[in-house]
Amino acid sequence: MNKQTIITALLALVALTGQAQEKKQKDIYMYGTVADGFTKASIPDVKVILLREDSTAVDTTKTYESYGYSSGIGRHPSTSRYYFQIKREPGKYILKAEHPNYETAYANFEMKQVGRRLQDIEGPKIYLKKSANAHHFEGGQLDEVVVKATKVKMVWRGDTLVFNADAFNVPEGSMLDGLIKQLPGVELKDNGEIFVNGKKIDNLTLNGADFFKGKNKIMLDNLPYFTVKNIEVYKKQTEENKYLGIEDEDKKEYTMDVILKREYSIGGSANVEAGGGTDDRYKLKGFGLRFSDHTRAVLFGGMNNINESMEYDTYDSDYKDKSQQSGDLHFKQVGGQFVYMAGEDKLTNSTEVNATWSDEYNENRSQSETYLNTGSTFSLSEGTSRSKPSSFSLKNTLRATGKYRLYSTAQLNYNRSRRESEGWNVTSADAVMKDSINSSWYRSRSQSDQLSGSGYAYLTKRLSSGDSWTFDMQGSFSRQYHPESTSQNHYVYHQLGTQDHRDRRTESPSSNYNWSAKVAYNYNLTENLRISPAVGYGTGDFHSDRHEYLRDSVDYLLDAKNSYEQATQTLNRRASLDINYSKNAHRGYFAIYTTLSANFQRQRMDYSSEPLTTSITRNYTLWSPNVYLFYMKQDSIKRQDMNVQYYLWPTTPSVTDLIDRPISSDPLNIFLGNPDLKQSEQHYFTMSYSQSRDSTDLNMSIRLNGSLTHNARTQGYTYDTTTGVRTYRPENISSGNWTIGMTLNWSRALDQKKLWHIGNELSLGYNKSTGLAIATRSTNAELSRVGNFTLNDKPNIRFQKGKLTLQAKGDIGYRHIHRNITIGEQPTDVWDIAYGLNGNYQLPWNFTIDTDLMMHSRRGYTDSEMNDNRLYWDAALTKSFRQGKWLLKLRGYDLLGQVSSLRYSINSQGRTETWTNSMRRYALLTVSYRFSQKPQKK
């Protein structure tokens, strides 16, 4: 595209912008709120009349409900808003508010000179006084559930999917997770992740408030189901965009909001559970809520040894997440949250505190195959480990709104880790483990203490012109104290007939500090078009030392060739431009958001060791374009959404990977650097379409996604077939690493009474990974390319009538593996199939029975012991007393003693099958008590 074409396009854009501004600048929207003068509660359906100064009518409207949200604070009480479109010129007006249960009220408003690009202006808040003959229940938001003969389970209200909690048969004594598992189209995973129609929930909130964000298990495992009125699913706009009046679909969070019943939203409630069982199993848990007009307090805690962690960090690995079935976990936790909200939403503050202690014992057995260009090697290993981590976190969130808007967070964390492990490993050139290459056993112990913190402040100002500016600053620090590990390792090289024993101690202190700041200006070109240029600056400082010691016959001596000290400084200079266009169409909405971001990054590392002392400086230009399209159409019959997104994510190599020197503290795994490493670029693409119909509870969605990595970094290695030593060197693979996938999710009611619901989630995926593993003395340097095709299908059908709920479900998983280098016979097809029934029934005399029966079948695993059929059976019987205040529950876990935990992983360098110990079957008897203090009626 030449320069003349660009100039012509820009002039055309300016001309169109000017015409649009001229057309729209004559009018402006005025909005305001109406509330009860005594309770300050919002009043719906108030008739508001706009009058001129001479009392002649201009326009008439009615108020409607609007909810406000604050990140980290939550959903504020609803407000009743009115809107008028008035002339963009100075003038005086009178607003008249009428309601059958209130006295008529008046408010004056003076329209002053405003900027041409200002789209709306706030009018007066009108307070009404209750009339003498007002209906008892009018004038506030009682918001009670309407009970019908057949309760509606789910309904769309605008862009919000609402589930009625009282319409589901949830077993007595259940927490929030028991309710969510019954919602049509909703999947709850063991790690606390929630998917609605195949799309992952970004944030699980309580009455709109962030509640230990990223740790869904805290609420899922502690909030009693009977406190819940509705569960709402919607896209929540960011707090800053709400203040600025910006509608940005790309930045919205997919949110599941748990709305409490009124008696638990104002007043207090508590739930305590305690019990014991076979094999010395025990459980103690408590959860308390206290609400008032301006405060909310939550206190929770518990301890158990039945693998209930009550916490989940979204950044942990997938394997650790599934600790519910694997390992033997003793867990303790205590935490709380306190929220204060000042009048008229001017100031809100939230404080969260949480402390955990764990004691986990694991046994594992694995069988792996490592791909080489000339064949494969095979390994067997067994090991045990015991870890005792503990943590403490304190977080505060503050929001203040006035002429400026301030939002800030501050967080402090302390983590303590203690771990012991031991085990053995053997590597062979053949699958039957007869041609051994090497073997080893180990015993290790490690400890570390880490203190970290972070802070964020965001300040914004909306100008009279309708534009706005924002300034934000953030910083963080972390420091490790006393990080030390000791290990004893014994190696046997069978083909050489030699042995090696090492007793090693490692000290690895580290610290990290960084800060950044950004300023942006939001310029409204027209009512539909906005541009936002921004610039930012930030620095980081990272220190990481490693001091290795080897023990001789007397004491530990410094291993100088494997010890080093390094310090890295990073400088980031960022610039970005957002161009956002949105338009309301007939019964629909269309938006396109584009971002072009550049980071001019400078990295400098000073590296010091006995064999090598050097400094490295690198400069990168990191481009991050992002394009997002959104379209929504809704009528009285159905709602449709479509999203398309593309973005590019560049990453730079670790500076330590650029140091070309060997690290041989582990004699079987030697690590080199590569000074020629390049930055990697990951291209992501997603497209989704969803449709819903209230008449049949239909929810359907289809999602396509793909990724392509250019210059992917991989740890290529050379393998010594005589000793089994791997010499690693990071390499860039220019192509051959990509993924593509499709997910189809749908659910609907089968009959008019909606007693039957059916659903299915089908996902297909293909992953291509490319790596480099070369055997020594080999002349063939062909890359290893592995294709991994996966299919997963989860059908289910549910029946609910009266006190009975039954569900049949399945989970069919299939994996096909293909390598470009095929030597000998290799298993290429793996099946994991599960199917079964679960249900609950409310028996006479306040008894409830709940059971889950699933058959798990595995085929295609290399280890023949893993190819089996196992029948899992859990059951519970509950009895409630004194109108549900007391509850006795007998739970049986793995009644048939069949639960087994397996994990299968594969990439371009090999595949691994891992078995981990599972908690043994047990029976547990618990008693729980729930207390509720309802607000006094005035």
For each feature predicted by the language model, list its residue ranges.
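Membrane-proximal, glycine/serine-rich, low-complexity loop/turn segments characteristic
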Residues: 21-27, 49-55, 89-91, 96, ...
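Structural motif
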Residues: 25, 33-44, 55, 151
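Short, ordered, surface-exposed loop/turn motifs in non-cytosolic proteins
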Residues: 39-64, 156
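Short Pro-Gly-centered beta-turn/loop motif in secreted/extracellular proteins
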Residues: 71-79, 83-92
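Outer-membrane beta-barrel translocator domains and adjoining extracellular loop/strand segments
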Residues: 244-246, 301, 310-317, 361-378, ...
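Outer membrane beta-barrel strand-and-loop segments of large Gram-negative receptors
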Residues: 382, 559-566, 672, 678, ...
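C-terminal beta-barrel architecture of Gram-negative outer-membrane proteins
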Residues: 808-880
